[in-house]
A protein has these predicted regions:
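Short hydrophobic/aromatic-rich motifs at helix boundaries and adjacent loops
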Residues: 6-7, 33-36, 73-78
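Acidic, low-complexity Ser/Thr/Gly/Pro-rich repeat segments typical of extracellular/periplasmic
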Residues: 52-121
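N-terminal non-catalytic regions of secreted/periplasmic and cell-surface proteins
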Residues: 27-64
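Extracytoplasmic/periplasmic copper-protein system
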Residues: 2, 25-33, 113-123
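Bacterial N-terminal signal peptides that target proteins for export
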Residues: 2-14
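Bacterial N-terminal signal peptides
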Residues: 12-24
Length: 123
């Protein structure tokens, strides 16, 4: 019985060590969105010429979409070539007055899937 208890304790110690050394490192490696241009919920007097997303760690954006409140899609011209970047800049053709939402999805360097959204209004 004592032999089983020792094995069980060793196993628990091994698992705890794994979580401490590997689990914590993985959670620290995830990227997060720091800022956007336009800022979330910004009200603009003219349409932006570009969208900018800044991250705290490199991120590979796999999807970037701009839609209006009716669900119409607008073209964004990316400059990142699907590489890991700290700052993504996407050029926009002029958009009419209205409410817009930007949706993005991506992968951090540790291949953790990430996503986010922000909105702005052109008056």
């Amino acid at each position: 019985m004592a032999n089983i208890t020792k094995k069980w304790l060793r196993f628990q110690l091994l698992m705890a060590s794994f979580v401490i050394f590997f689990g914590a490192g993985l959670s620290w490696a995830h990227s997060k969105q720091e800022t956007t241009v336009p800022a979330n919920n910004a009200v603009l007097t003219e349409a932006p010429a570009e969208l900018v997303l800044k991250f705290d760690k490199p991120m590979r954006i796999t999807k970037l979409a701009l839609t209006d409140r009716f669900g119409n899609d607008y073209e964004v011209q990316r400059t990142d070539q699907m590489k890991h970047v700290l700052k993504l800049v996407a050029q926009l053709d002029p958009v009419p007055k209205g409410e817009y939402k930007v949706d993005w999805r991506g992968l951090s360097e540790d291949v953790h899937p990430m996503k986010g959204t922000f909105s702005f209004t052109v008056k």
